[in-house]
Amino acid sequence: MFAQLDTKTVYSFMDSLIDLNHYFERAKQFGYHTIGIMDKDNLYGAYHFIKGCQKNGLQPVLGLEIEILYQERQVLLNLIAQNTQGYHQLLKISTAKMSGKLHMDYFCQHLEGIAVIIPSKGWSDTLVVPFDYYMGVDQYTDLSHMDSKRQLIPLRTVRYFAQDDMETLHMLHAIRDNLSLAETPVVESDQELADCQQLTAFYQTHCPQALQNLEDLVSGIYYDFDTNLKLPHFNRDKSAKQELQDLTEAGLKEKGLWKEPYQSRLLHELVIISDMGFDDYFLIVWDLLRFGRSKGYYMGMGRGSAAGSLVAYALNITGIDPVQHDLLFERFLNKERYSMPDIDIDLPDIYRSEFLRYVRNRYGSDHSAQIVTFSTFGQAIRDVFKRFGVPEYELTNLTKKIGFKDSLATVYEKSISFRQVINSRTEFQKAFAIAKRIEGNPRQTSIHAAGIVMSDDALTNHIPLKSGDDMMITQYDAHAVEANGLLKMDFLGLRNLTFVQKMQEKVAKDYGCQIDITAIDLEDPQTLALFAKGDTKGIFQFEQNGAINLLKRIKPQRFEEIVATTSLNRPGASDYTTNFIKRREGQEKIDLIDPVIAPILEPTYGIMLYQEQVMQIAQVYAGFTLGKADLLRRAMSKKNLQEMQKMEEDFIASAKHLGRAEETARGLFKRMEKFAGYGFNRSHAFAYSALAFQLAYFKAHYPAVFYDIMMNYSSSDYITDALESDFQVAQVTINSIPYTDKIEASKIYMGLKNIKGLPRDFAYWIIEQRPFNSVEDFLTRTPEKYQKKVFLEPLIKIGLFDCFEPNRKKILDNLDGLLVFVNELGSLFSDSSFSWVDTKDYSVTEKYSLEQEIVGVGMSKHPLIDIAEKSTQTFTPISQLVKESEAVVLIQIDSIRIIRTKTSGQQMAFLSVNDTKKKLDVTLFPQEYAIYKDQLKEGEFYYLKGRIKERDHRLQMVCQQVQMAISQKYWLLVENHQFDSQISEILGAFPGTTPVVIHYQKNKETIALTKIQVHVTENLKEKLRPFVLKTVFR
């Protein structure tokens, strides 16, 4: 029977449409018993192909297509692994090929268990190679020209499932080669997956011996994977068990903890670790963290269930004492649940590449590798539509309608406007069909963000590799790597560890004190107060609005309640926040069910927040071992009904044996079952809450250091938060501006790095060359390559030359002339001076807006402050608003979102506003929005009057009145009240947004008109002339 060998899969990137799952399905439909894959150079899909075939009752044949240089010509070869030995040879051959190291001598040394096929299209009678091979033939091969001494074998290339896939493959080739469809060569026909019986009949008729050769070749093919654990040995000269014991005992003694119950707990853990064969694993993790600390890196407090291990604490793998804080080792590791211990290594993100180099050098480049991932066609629609000639602006408009997680089919179903665009043109419908066909297919390789694989022997004995920058990269994904018994470790580059380290260094530099951040008091009052206020912008795990609002509700009074907040800030658990608060305040009864489990539930007021509580209850109440309790916890969290039913009966029987009432036991089990579904890992919550507390400690005690580091090392915006904490943005000059942001004496000095598009080299040049004496001096000394308006204008607009010429508009308007002057005249006539042309400067508001546009924040005095200082109207700062009160706020509008109500279809608006210190959400219902909509504009300043409400634990305003707030007013000087009615009538005829103030000279009375605002024009001035002494607009 025919077997399909030469199938290119989607892992031959953009050269096939054969994905493995559909391949298995179609192969069975077409009557195949044996199928193969033969991707070019790589084995990316090999493991999943073999396992998928076995699962689907198909015989897998693993192949590989390569080209190899021999006698100055490239020879095309198709290789077949005939057995497990051949499989391992393919691993090595593919690795050599994907590393650019494959040559004929190496190839010939790895041919045991390999069948070599040379396709007829690549053969010539002059070809002589140093190995035996089959001749591959297809339906179009002219057999009369073949070498009669060679064994023939059917070899038909497949790249797609059906003929109508050809157009899609043509599109993939166009995308791959970055060509238009017209420029892309047409796809070869007759490369679809054909019916097995038809091909069998063809070869039986035309080339029966080739078919027999094929059957003989594949008949005995079978592959066996070695899935046994292959942990590296840490030290071959010493027992890992003894070394681990020595190190952990020394670690506890150094911490002053060589006493009970630590000694017995340590022995208990060491026995389990040794019995499970993980001594080397702990030593390797210890070694890696030791390397980081030896370099001065802050390695954090640990993460995950590993924080429950005393061995990990003794080795300084974690920074949490699990005995003191009642954390469970069995949640991490136990003999009743055999699985690899999972200690993820957190490290400062800026040093991850150094760790990779250390692993490579310490454990060997053949024994360690990064793990591959595959980038897929997520934005397939952009790639495809582009090849159909759709303009970029249309593409952008179309892709905006696609959500991050939406499939094309989903967005087509959900979005009417998207559907209308697709159906508007025939070519759009065609392109959309193609985009759906390739969506989700792998496009290229990438690297796992954290994963590293390590092995005791050469990795290529187990998996294929490819070359990488810092170290080799696996061809198998993480699942296949672990399935082959290899140790996968996650090296997680955490930006927050970088923050802590840089803050420690800056405190030492600026304040002359060394802070051991791991030894700070986790009950520090100032830091707890910061959490209680929800002042946690920039604090790991607590900077999102949900967490901030939760903190404001809970108002943690001790560190344990911060840990609880982490756990409550999750779906399901958050439903118990009100109960938690009321019980803590004594406003709700705490049901502890049974005195024997009261100590377990009391810290969380009777609420099972943590997975460990479920385990401890099973241990104390029903006599389960902690290992068995962990199996119960897992069954509950995974909702394994069959296992839970069995466990429930076991729980009841064990509880009854200990004298518990059956009804109470059943009720307790149901309660445990309910909470286990969303209970959080307490060890992980504790470790990460400790890291959060460390960051918050700096924010509470060294705010200038905190904001300095956050602004320079984070991509997020912390300026607003700093301003809310009473920091101010300082005005800088060309002679004082730093490169990075700097904070001194509560002043924020924005750096040159914030100026979008400014070359780094130019910024460095400015710092190195200053001081400058004038605008002309700066331009004269500026290198010609930087004498471009695109580089110079931002410097002018943010006021860096105000120290020489405060009129920024004047410098900008004269810039062309200045550049001519310094280049042509300045060098010839050093005593000459530039003739400036005068012009009106930008307004305060315009200057501020330009600064915001260029560096993201205003550096001048905020226009609102100027308005507030001159305001004759009473208003309340946003920070002092009280719920259920009427208030007026003076604000700037950041954004306006308009919607239609579901009931009436009328428009209403949601505003996001700020008063330079705080932000506020404002709602205008249809009636108010209809009145004021023409006045509202983003970036403008207003007095808003309304009712203060609380929603989702945040204050917001329901707006009733809107009034423009501008610092300029229209002043009228009049003799007395004689012409009040005439003046009022004239002012009413010129409605606008400028407030009017009248000063009566006779009695020295000044009145700000509250009901009249005007549009100032020359016509208004002329109309008022007979009735006033003077008008001033300022």
Curated annotation (Swiss-Prot):
One of its GO terms (biological process) is DNA replication. It catalyses: DNA(n) + a 2'-deoxyribonucleoside 5'-triphosphate = DNA(n+1) + diphosphate. GO terms for molecular function: 3'-5' exonuclease activity; DNA-directed DNA polymerase activity; nucleic acid binding. InterPro entries: DNA_pol3_alpha_NTPase_dom (IPR011708), DNA_pol3_alpha_thumb_dom (IPR041931), DNA_pol3_finger (IPR040982), DnaE2/DnaE/PolC (IPR004805), DNAPol_HHH (IPR029460), NA-bd_OB-fold (IPR012340), NA-bd_OB_tRNA (IPR004365), PHP_dom (IPR004013). Belongs to the DNA polymerase type-C family. DnaE subfamily. This is DNA polymerase III subunit alpha. Its EC number is 2.7.7.7. DNA polymerase III is a complex, multichain enzyme responsible for most of the replicative synthesis in bacteria. This DNA polymerase also exhibits 3' to 5' exonuclease activity. The alpha chain is the DNA polymerase. DNA polymerase III contains a core (composed of alpha, epsilon and theta chains) that associates with a tau subunit. This core dimerizes to form the PolIII' complex. PolIII' associates with the gamma complex (composed of gamma, delta, delta', psi and chi chains) and with the beta chain to form the complete DNA polymerase III complex. It holds the Pfam family HHH_6. It is found in: Cytoplasm. Keywords: Cytoplasm, DNA replication, DNA-directed DNA polymerase, Nucleotidyltransferase, Transferase. One of its GO terms (cellular component) is cytoplasm.
